[in-house]
Amino acid sequence: MKRRVVVTGLGAVTPVGNTVEEFWSSVREGKVGIGPITKFDTSEYKVKLAAEVKGFSAKERMDFKAAKRMEPFAQYAVAAAKEAFEDAKIDMSQENPYRAGVIVGSGIGSLQAVETNYEKILQKGP
């Protein structure tokens, strides 16, 4: 069975840009997103470099109350999905919500945090 998939919007939170526009501009300019690790003390580790997301503000990109319950990687995914949805310019009041979806990709996330937060949501609700 063949099914059509239509990409209608794009969103990005990356080490070289926190929006699609910033990302593409950085890619065209050949910017590198790898640099010294700043999120934690690396003195006990051999690896000192990473591709960290910089300058991201959850307050500016989503409901902050919801963001406080998320790990940073989830905040990045939600912000990128929100940007993609806005980029699509679809009026969902005119669409069947069961025929729409968002594909989210993340290089890695905290599985422990996913488990912990899943349990919290089950117990307390979203």
Model-assigned labels for residue ranges:
Residues 1-126:
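Conserved "HGTGT" condensation-loop signature of ketosynthase/thiolase-family condensing enzymes
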